[in-house]
């Protein structure tokens, strides 16, 4: 039963992430993200549809029902609160935080959540700049807001310019090699970097180091103008 619950939560969280990135949630995208076969994803989505968690729209996109969105919000809230705890209190290496929080999100109790919002200094966003949703359910002012800034893919031009990193989406943290390159260049949320689009390839420059973003990740970092 626990495996079934964990799978449901992973699917809902993935749909939530895709929406956050501005990507249409399709079964094919879930298959890519979770590295599962098409038939497996279709079977799981069909079960979730029967359970009243998602609806498959006419364009084949997946839409969460109010019940599904409530559950997805709770999972993401636990995940990002765990990231704050692991970073701010425990001091875990930033490159290990996401994977560890993925484990915590399935087992964190409501009571622990309520304690965390009292213990942590900042519960508005994760260490990666992602909004922590559904805080109103824990008695904290609701931080549900549009993602800050602009996607790098929408902002970069052939003319280099300085910007500030404000958000690094979940999927970027999973791409170990690319995330390591970012950390090696000391690029974090709040870093001022130079961005440029060179023949369709976006590069971030910081402290004399360049990071060329993979094409399928250029939409997962958000910036604001200086």
Curated annotation (Swiss-Prot):
GO BP: negative regulation of DNA-templated transcription
Alphabetic keyword roster: Cytoplasm, DNA-binding, Iron, Repressor, Transcription, Transcription regulation
InterPro entries for this protein: DtxR/IdeR_SH3 (IPR040767), DtxR_MntR_Metal-Reg (IPR050536), Fe_dep_repressor (IPR001367), Fe_dep_repressor_sf (IPR036421), FeoA_core_dom (IPR038157), HTH_DTXR (IPR022687), Iron_dep_repressor (IPR022689), Transcriptional_repressor_C (IPR008988)
Domain of life: Bacteria
Cellular component aspect of the GO annotation: cytoplasm
Subcellular location: Cytoplasm
Limits of the HTH dtxR-type domain: 4-65
Major subcellular location class: cytoplasm
Biological role stated in the UniProt entry: Iron-binding repressor of the dipheteria toxin gene expression. May serve as a global regulator of gene expression. Represses ripA under iron excess.
Similarity remark: Belongs to the DtxR/MntR family.
PANTHER family (UniProt xref): IRON (METAL) DEPENDENT REPRESSOR, DTXR FAMILY, IRON-DEPENDENT REPRESSOR IDER
Record's subunit section: Homodimer.
Name used for this protein in its record: Diphtheria toxin repressor
């Amino acid at each position: 039963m626990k495996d079934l619950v964990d799978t449901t939560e992973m699917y809902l969280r993935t749909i939530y992430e895709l929406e956050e990135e501005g990507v249409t949630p399709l079964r094919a995208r879930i298959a890519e993200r979770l590295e599962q076969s098409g038939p497996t994803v279709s079977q799981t989505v069909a079960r979730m549809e029967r359970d009243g968690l998602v609806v498959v729209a006419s364009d084949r996109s997946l839409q969460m029902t109010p019940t599904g969105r409530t559950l997805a919000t709770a999972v993401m809230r636990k995940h990002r609160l765990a990231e704050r705890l692991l970073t701010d209190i425990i001091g875990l290496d930033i490159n290990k935080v996401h994977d560890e929080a993925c484990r915590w999100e399935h087992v964190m109790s409501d009571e622990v959540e309520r304690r965390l919002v009292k213990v942590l200094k900042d519960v508005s966003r994760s260490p990666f700049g992602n909004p922590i949703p559904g805080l109103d359910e824990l008695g904290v002012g609701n931080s549900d807001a549009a993602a800050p800034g602009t996607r790098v893919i929408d902002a970069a031009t052939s003319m280099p310019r300085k910007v500030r990193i404000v958000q690094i989406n979940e999927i970027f943290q999973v791409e170990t090699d690319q995330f390591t390159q970012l950390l090696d260049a000391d690029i974090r949320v709040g870093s001022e970097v130079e961005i440029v689009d060179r023949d369709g390839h976006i590069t971030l420059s910081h402290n004399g180091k360049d990071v060329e973003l993979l094409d399928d990740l250029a939409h997962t970092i958000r910036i604001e103008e200086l």
